[in-house]
């Protein structure tokens, strides 16, 4: 029985294909029970690596069934067929993902970015308070609802933190995520605090929101890592970012894990606080290189409204591929950094983690 027939029996009328990842495909569908459209993630156990099926998939399904937050994609139903196909029925991000939005729209005005980033940070705090880490925070995994609110999705690399006898979180040794959003310690293959890793990814996302470009060029992992370890963050002058915004990004993209901000410190940062009421004319206001915005900061989603200035590091035209190095295969790392770094949208292997750390 094909996917459409399986879903039809469950009360879902299949629509269009929304995307395809390494181990799954996503389709839209209309739920006769819920009376609205949903997204259905379909995973075939037979076509999925054993390590993913045995370790990551159970974690993802467990966490999806647990989390409940307004800025996290809702999961309505999970079921499996006798032949090993898993169907995860979720909330549909009707406005697409944040990456596509920014590629179309350009850098966001700080007021808009503040609202979205506060929503994302709130979702991450909710997860961290439950000792759940995402480990693949990136713009492609941030979906937008009809009102352009952030919805965190794709918990494929998520896990529940383990604690030792003293209550301290056990360091993670599975180096996963997407290279452009990965923290320096992860790229170096150093056992890491998973919550602190999530924080770094938040900094990359915020930079993309307000600059419309990547903070680092990930076409050369070794060079990128060197710049990150020097705590260099360059901001385009054309964006005229406020000092508070740049301060928050700079403090999040801190290579020293002991000095990197925690999620509560991010949420209490001055830039994220609601702006004080002030008189404002009804006329649109303008910021150099950003175009015109309505006084109430509504988002203009029309294609072609890119900012005047081109980004220093262009946003990827393809989704960022994930990296995954598990403890079991660390001893089989080979030196392939030079050849893989030449690929524009490459998969980070164990070799890259090992070489980047030297």
UniProtKB/Swiss-Prot annotation:
Catalytic-site annotation from UniProt: 136 (proton acceptor)
UniProt xrefs under Gene3D superfamilies: Transferase(Phosphotransferase) domain 1
InterPro entries to which the protein is assigned, alphabetical: Kinase-like_dom_sf, Prot_kinase_dom, Protein_kinase_ATP_BS, Ser/Thr_kinase_AS
Region (Disordered), start-end ranges: 296-358
Compartments, as annotated in UniProt: Cytoplasm; Cytoplasm, Cytoskeleton, Microtubule organizing center, Centrosome, Centriole; Cytoplasmic vesicle, Secretory vesicle, Acrosome
Record comment: activity regulation: Activated by phosphorylation on Thr-174, potentially by autophosphorylation.
CDD domains: STKc_TSSK1_2-like
Domain Protein kinase: 12-272
Tissue expression as described in the entry: Testis-specific. Expressed only in the spermatids postmeiotically at the final stages of cytodifferentiation in the seminiferous tubules (at protein level). Not detected in released sperms in the lumen of the seminiferous tubules. Also present in the epididymal sperm (at protein level).
Record text on cofactor binding: Mg(2+) and Mn(2+) were both present in the kinase buffer but Mg(2+) is likely to be the in vivo cofactor.
SMART domains: S_TKc
This protein's GO CC annotations: acrosomal vesicle; centriole; cytoplasm
One BP annotation, GO: spermatid development
Post-translation changes: Autophosphorylated. Ubiquitinated; HSP90 activity negatively regulates ubiquitination and degradation.
Superkingdom per UniProt: Eukaryota
Residues annotated to bind ATP: 18-26, 41
Keywords, sorted A to Z: ATP-binding, Cytoplasm, Cytoplasmic vesicle, Cytoskeleton, Developmental protein, Differentiation, Kinase, Magnesium, Metal-binding, Nucleotide-binding, Phosphoprotein, Serine/threonine-protein kinase, Spermatogenesis, Transferase, Ubl conjugation
Entry similarity comment: Belongs to the protein kinase superfamily. CAMK Ser/Thr protein kinase family.
Function: Testis-specific serine/threonine-protein kinase required during spermatid development. Phosphorylates 'Ser-281' of TSKS and SPAG16. Involved in the late stages of spermatogenesis, during the reconstruction of the cytoplasm. During spermatogenesis, required for the transformation of a ring-shaped structure around the base of the flagellum originating from the chromatoid body.
Entry protein name: Testis-specific serine/threonine-protein kinase 2
Organism: Mus musculus
